Amino acid sequence: MAAGGPCPAAAGGGPGGASCSVGAPGGVSMFRWLEVLEKEFDKAFVDVDLLLGEIDPDQADITYEGRQKMTSLSSCFAQLCHKAQSVSQINHKLEAQLVDLKSELTETQAEKVVLEKEVHDQLLQLHSIQLQLHAKTGQSVDSGTIKAKLSGPSVEELERELEANKKEKMKEAQLEAEVKLLRKEDEALRGHIAVLQAEVYGARLAAKYLDKELAGRVQQIQLLGRDMKGPAHDKLWNQLEAEIHLHRHKTVIRACRGRNDLKRPMQAPPGHDQDSLKKSQGVGPIRKVLLLKEDHEGLGISITGGKEHGVPILISEIHPGQPADRCGGLHVGDAILAVDGVNLRDTKHKEAVTVLSQQRGEIEFEVVYVAPEVDSDDENVEYEDESGHRYRLYLDELEGGGNPGASCKDPSGEIKVLQGFNKKAVTDTHENGDLGTASETPLDDGASKLDDLHTLYHKKSY
């Protein structure tokens, strides 16, 4: 079972909620103040957008220009937040380096004093040995005072001193070797960081382009539909909203599936073949799954999403050997619609965690499978660090001198929103009525399935 706090929707940010374990709240962010600013900006942005929407339809040009400027402003704010985070991180690094340099300076000064004392002692010992040598050869040297102060070192003391010097030299040689290795590692990491920065820059350019392109498409739809009134207008916007939330859902599922082991291919539930899923826009029928949980066990799943993120409660991970894995009926990316009769369609993340954590014994899940769309970038999800985080990078192309620029798809190919008002979706999401059986039998196509899809993926909330 997993839960997590909501991720604030910054300008250009993603909608998904981060999954984390129940009973282990996430750490406080280093940039709490930046999150507050982002929330205030989002609120002001939405307020201005609503004000622009109240302008007379005859002055649609003013609305269009105003929203174009708002898009540019949102992009600038996102870049400013990125730069602020970068500057803050660099500042922390410089502060840490300053502390290290001060510590090294103190150690160096102490070593200098010790070395000066050692040199002084060595000189005195050398003088004492020279005087002893002169005395043995019969040379008369006025050194009685020096002999009285210094006694010549014994052979054992000299051997111990030589051994100590040898150990110190070995430590020095080891430190030099470590410095060389660290320099090589630093050079390699700097190159890797340069590659990551190039990829992030390309991704940001792509996101900025898609943001502007989507805003333009929405404005075009608004201009085309300004003469529509009544049910036809509501139907159009319900369909648009359902399409947007469906693609958001699929994006979150792709991210969840990307965290799983590549050696364990993710399987769709039985009966969900690719052809039937394509006909239904990737949405499978509602199904019921029984899960048996002992009192000393957890459910064995991690969840993400929630009403505040604009997506349903999603299963982001299934832990091996736990009840969810043993039952075999739950899959990563399943949207949890209800559990033991408790409706979770319009539930926030924290509330869903509370409900799921309280379940005992035999538990009935009501879920629906949404197949993520195949993305060309998914082939590059190859890198996974020690913490289990995986990154979608183009390292081979970039490190080989390839073009770091990002290729942007036309959003019109991704979001098909004007294919007729009577387009049907096969997902029945009535919150009351017959919800099907455990045999994965889809409901018969009733009227206004787009309204049902809109109900599943929530209404807008700012």
UniProtKB/Swiss-Prot annotation:
**PDZ domain location:** 288-371
Region described as Disordered: 427-449
Give Gene Ontology CC terms: dendrite; Golgi membrane; postsynaptic density; trans-Golgi network transport vesicle
The record, for InterPro entries, names: GOPC (IPR038879), PDZ (IPR001478), PDZ_sf (IPR036034)
Q: Which Pfam families match?
A: PDZ
Q: Where is it mainly found?
A: cytoplasm
Q: How does it sit in the membrane?
A: Peripheral membrane protein
Compartment(s) of residence = Cytoplasm; Golgi apparatus membrane; Golgi apparatus, trans-Golgi network membrane; Synapse
UniProt keywords (A-Z) are: Cell projection, Coiled coil, Cytoplasm, Golgi apparatus, Membrane, Protein transport, Synapse, Transport
Q: Name one GO molecular function term.
A: transmembrane transporter binding
Q: Which residues form a coiled coil?
A: 83-194
Query: Which Gene3D superfamilies would you find in this protein's record?
Result: 2.30.42.10
GO biological-process terms attached to the record: negative regulation of protein localization to cell surface; protein transport
Per the entry's comment, what about the domains?
The PDZ domain mediates interactions with FZD5, FZD8, ASIC3, GRID2, CFTR, CLCN3 and ADRB1. The coiled-coil region probably mediates association to membranes, targeting to the Golgi, and interactions with GOLGA3, RHOQ, and STX6.
Protein purpose: Plays a role in intracellular protein trafficking and degradation. May regulate CFTR chloride currents and acid-induced ASIC3 currents by modulating cell surface expression of both channels. May also regulate the intracellular trafficking of the ADR1B receptor. May play a role in autophagy. Together with MARCHF2 mediates the ubiquitination and lysosomal degradation of CFTR. Overexpression results in CFTR intracellular retention and degradation in the lysosomes.
* Self-association state and partner proteins as the record states: Homooligomer. Interacts with FZD5. Interacts with FZD8. Interacts with GRID2 and BECN1. Interacts with CSPG5. Interacts with CLCN3. Interacts with STX6. Interacts with CFTR. Interacts with ASIC3. Interacts with GOLGA3. Interacts with NLGN1. Interacts with RHOQ. Interacts with MARCHF2; the interaction leads to CFTR ubiquitination and degradation. May interact with CACNG2. Interacts with CCDC62.
Descriptive protein name: Golgi-associated PDZ and coiled-coil motif-containing protein
Native organism is: Pongo abelii (Sumatran orangutan)
Gene, per the UniProt record? GOPC
